[in-house]
């Protein structure tokens, strides 16, 4: 994309928040790369590798890098796939209701819990906000959506129903 004298190129990056991008901004023979919160332990590490491939051999004048962590002190980094396997093991050990607290904007984590519920023959019950997130991103990426996937349901608190009927 060209904006005035600037050429801006976006690169999809594997991030816990859906739709994040790295940006290469070029003008007058100079370039700035903003990496976004780049990571290799998510569900799509190929995105970061592609960014590295595309930019290898190119000169970047300034790089702005964001990161929430740069590894684990003991070197035992857990991927989202490994975390999903651990969730499945824990859910299989639980005799009854399983509750989890995480941000539904962390789409990889949300997907891990939904997939874990399916693998353990349980129903994933989302709050209204989580259902909204799933609905919004379903047009961009294949995710289970309440109403279309029988193992994903939505919990509507009575106060939500009461306020909806008053309108």
Segments (PLM) and residue ranges:
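Acidic, Ser/Thr-rich peripheral helices and adjacent loops at domain boundaries
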Residues: 133-167
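His/Asp/Glu-rich metal-coordinating catalytic cores
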Residues: 1-119, 123-129, 134, 140-147
